[in-house]
Amino acid sequence: MAWILLIIAGLLEVGWAIGLKYSEGFSRFWPSVGTVAAMIMSLWLLGSAAKTLPIGTAYSIWVGIGSVGTVALGIALLGEEVNAMRLISVALIVVGIISLKLATPA
């Protein structure tokens, strides 16, 4: 169950990171409300997952999911640049996430 909570927390991190862009520095009300709500839920779920998972693993995977998802949505929704270095970097993050999962009992 902790892994499921962690994945949801990571996806919510992607949501609030993209929400930061749409809130335009918290100057737009509804995108700001959604961003703050996603932040709170993401951190709460991370904390819940960290009750049973090692904090180093939980935090690293949370950040990794957030990073990979934010890069992907930045490309897909915001027209951010796609280049070989970005794709290789994201692939390395994914390898790190998988390695941490495999190295963590639970």
Say what each PLM segment does.
Residues 1-106:
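Polytopic alpha-helical membrane proteins, predominantly small-molecule transporters/carriers
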